[in-house]
Amino acid sequence: DALLIMPNDKNTNIKESIENLSKKNNEKVQYHPNVYRPWGSFEILLTKKNYQVKKLIINPNQKISLQKHKHRSEHWVVVKGNASVTKNNKVYNLKKNYSIDIPKETKHRIENKEKTPLVIIEIQTGNKLLENDIIRFEDIYNRN
């Protein structure tokens, strides 16, 4: 679902307006700012040319897939809860105010082993910040 707000005198040009946004690669045409996944959700807080900021919420006893990205690096800051982060073959336990860098091409995963939601601020950097820039190695939700 989407909501488009524009002046009344322009309402006959809705299709054209969306096509113009698409031509400009405006992510608002492609992604809603709140996205739900089997493990929880994320909210896109800010998107610029070479960086993006998200708020991730990992539900209790859930984890994201073991994955890597070809085109982006990520920096995670725990703002609520405790995270178990896999980075390559090492596991890091991060509590509130702790952070970790995930360079591109690095296998990684976030897991919430707690009984309350885990909240992380994610800063992505790179030349291509696309949701489909993901190579999954393990996924308990059977996604490719």
Which residues fall in each region the model found?
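C-terminal structural segments of small proteins and small subunits
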Residues: I121-L129
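Conserved double-stranded beta-helix
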Residues: I135, I140-N144
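Glycine-rich GHKL/ HATPase_c ATP-binding element in histidine kinases
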Residues: L118
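Left-handed beta-helix
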Residues: A2-V77, N82-I100, H108-R109, K113, ...
